[in-house]
């Protein structure tokens, strides 16, 4: 079962994303900011990270930069969801907010199948 880490500072959206991915058959963990997400990735590397870009403590761009700088996490596919898509430069795919759940699942599925090959 693919493991997905959802990173968003909005608890309601995090809950909703968890439910969507769980119903699609994925094991899901979540974090409320980039710093908590880094700790989660180091504890148990996910198969995919789905992250917001604008968060407190550590924002999405910094979180992605740190993931990419560590050999153990550099190849984890990253799907950025953001109202400001130019912030997601190092992500493997970007879905602008607002987005449709079906499209989110489709892009996430492609990243899980092909890894970072979509870049």
Language model features by range: what are they?
Residues 10-14:
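Short acidic/polar segment at the start of the alpha1 helix of CheY-like receiver
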Residues 15-23:
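Charged docking surfaces used in two-component/phosphorelay signaling
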Residues 52:
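Active-site residues of response regulator receiver
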Residues 55:
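Receiver (REC) domain active-site loop signature in two-component systems and cognate sites
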Residues 79-81:
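Hydrophobic/aromatic residues positioned on beta-strands within the core alpha/beta folds
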Residues 99-112, 116:
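C-terminal output helix
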